[in-house]
Amino acid sequence: MQDLSGFSVPKGFRGGNAIKVQLWWAVQATIFAWSPQVLYRWRAFLLRLFGAKIGKNVVIRPSVKITYPWKLTLGDYAWVGDDVNLYTLGEITIGAHSVISQKSYLCTGSHDHASQHFTINATPIVIGEKCWLATDVFVAPGVTIGDGTVVGARSSVFKSLPANVVCRGNPAVVIRERVETE
């Protein structure tokens, strides 16, 4: 059984020193979160200032939560909706023209349940280009979602998904191919 008295965060795990982490959290809770909806470039600037790789014309809502922006890459024209949580203990990459809809949660971190000291770990998440994660989708550590894939509302993605398909469910399963109409 677990004994949390022996838990510790591995050295370098956060990717930044304690001052950088606390400064980001203060900025995120104030001038990032309080900025008007339309100030997408302002929020992109703040994220770049803290080491995020942000493409052009990215839409990031002010209520988005990002644990460590220096572990985030957003492609050109990516959209990140209201109340999305990007739990960047590990790297998160969101491809160009992809949409992460409101209340979705991308979780790169977990704990080893077999470890007595509940060891923390992180595995990257990659969302391909031209994807759409609909409202309230959960994406687990280590998942890759192929280019052009749609994940339906309130789905949970625990395994990687192929390109150009429509998926839904808990766990998410492929329903059909995604076919462009234009």
UniProtKB/Swiss-Prot annotation:
Keywords: Acyltransferase, Lipopolysaccharide biosynthesis, Repeat, Transferase. Belongs to the transferase hexapeptide repeat family. It comes from the Bacteria. Its EC number is 2.3.1.-. The lineage of its organism: Bacteria, Pseudomonadati, Pseudomonadota, Gammaproteobacteria, Enterobacterales. Pathway: Slime biogenesis; slime polysaccharide biosynthesis. PROSITE patterns: HEXAPEP_TRANSFERASES. CDD domains: LbH_wcaF_like. This is Putative colanic acid biosynthesis acetyltransferase WcaF.
